[in-house]
Amino acid sequence: MSKYRVHVECAKTLPETNSLYVQCLSYVVGAPTEGIARAKAVEMARQHYVEYDSFMPYHTEKLK
């Protein structure tokens, strides 16, 4: 199983100002393929940051 570093962008709309708040996270996950690694990272982000509305993996790199 390979290890991947997956960068995930989390976003939510602030109701007070109707503006978009964005935070970027990075996870290192073990997975057999890049697609599964991306899915795992998004799932971890959803569990840890429930206050965000959208999650998008924007970069994935295979680690040695």
Language-model region placement:
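A short, exposed loop/beta-hairpin motif centered on an aromatic-Gly-Thr core
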Residues: L20-I36
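Short, mixed-charge low-complexity intrinsically disordered segments
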Residues: E43-K64
